Amino acid sequence: MEDKEEKKAPSVIDRYFTRWYRTDLKGKPCEDHCILQHSNRICVITLAESHPIFQNGRKIKNINYQISDGCSRLKNKVSGKSKRGGQFLTEFAPLCRITCTDEQEFTIFSCIRGRLLEVNEVILNKPDLLMEKPSTEGYIAVILPKFEESKSVTEGLLTREQYEEILTKRNQQEVPC
């Protein structure tokens, strides 16, 4: 009998979502974000595995969805089938600020235009989820792009292959993250 390699079944994320990436957001080296796009247009904003939060054994001290005095992502309320009432976000709209125990602060951005459906309030009390399960329970927010923009929303984003090429180049150049 011939030895067959056991193939691991794809995860739910890999099966139902397409991964897109935005690197060096706002010119900050290695501050990479990952956008998980479902076939129904919904996008889940997460941190890419190369983000500095995951480097050098950092620990998260605080996550704050209060963007400014008059704007808190926690106050976002949507209702109805078409999700009316959600805050509209541009590509560079801040979603939250994450402070690490070394006092380094990172602003997480939406990366795409669309309506904010929800933010992950669970990570406020369990910030370790962001480190342990960034693509599932440790997500940042869920955004719904406008229907007419749902195809163009990925323009300017990188595929998994393009992202891995950038990571390879960084490793060769030894760019500090």
From Swiss-Prot:
Species annotation: Danio rerio (Zebrafish)
Location, primary (coarse class): nucleus
Entry keyword set: Cell projection, Nucleus
Keyword check for Transmembrane helix: no
Family from the record: Belongs to the ABITRAM family.
Gene that encodes the chain: abitram
Record-linked InterPro entries: Abitram, GCV_H/Fam206, Single_hybrid_motif
Gene3D superfamilies membership: 2.40.50.100
GO cellular component: dendrite; filopodium tip; growth cone; lamellipodium; nuclear speck; nucleus
Protein name from the UniProt record: Protein Abitram
Nucleus as UniProt keyword: yes
